[in-house]
Amino acid sequence: MSHTTDNGRYELLVDRSFVAQHYLTVPDPDPPEGTVHSHRFTVEVLLAGDSLGEYNYLVNINDLVALLDDLEQRYRDAVLNDLPEFEGENPSVERFARVISDRVHDGLSTDRLDSLTVRVWEDDLARASYETDI
């Protein structure tokens, strides 16, 4: 059966897990949030668009995997507070999602993408996401 119209949307999702540290810079944080502590972060990058390219890719998955490999190397075992992208900022899980989103957006060809969503889990209970239209 052939479809003459297609109102569907393609999505591509890749994730990564790594341990990184941070401390929150808010007034009177609950322990241990005000001191350096570790989280096993899981980062999920979801790309979406309504058309595929020449090879039926939304984006080349190898490019996205390589970009996430680079991000994992940057953040694995790092204290987020010490990195320039968090200078003067509270390194909340929400902020971390935005930082990763900006880096993914800058590192990929986005000509076929409509949206980019980054979800970051800091543990089994808490996650934040940042979604942007492209």
Report each predicted region and the residues it spans:
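Charge-rich, low-complexity N-terminal segments
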Residues: M1-I134
